Amino acid sequence: MNISKYSKKKFYEGIGLWRVDDAFADPMFNYLVYGFSPGSFFTSVLANDFLSAVAHSHPSNTITALKALTGWMQDYMPRRAFGSYEAVKEWLDMDETTRREILIMHNLICTPKQETFLEIKGEEYEM
């Protein structure tokens, strides 16, 4: 899926409200936008598999970082994208047009019209 720098900014502004660590935010961005597998730890988190998440967790992962991520997931992430291994697999297998529509519906990225307008307007862009 091709998205503009404005959609990327919008996504990261939302995830930033929860102070989600970049090491957690980047895999979520790539999972949601591009349908990339987020790895064993994040797949377990997305599937609500606590035992597997802990088993696959990196020693530097903290409870504070995990709480921020799960708070953001509850507030922003499309319900279709998490909750079980089946939901994760369906998201990974989903075509990019459908993923884009869902992300727009959840206000995680801009519509193509919004992206074009911001580009023409020369909207400031800082990440």
PLM feature spans:
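N-terminal soluble segments of membrane proteins
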Residues: 1, 125-127
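N-terminal functional modules and adjacent low-complexity/disordered segments of proteins
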Residues: 6, 23, 36, 112-115, ...
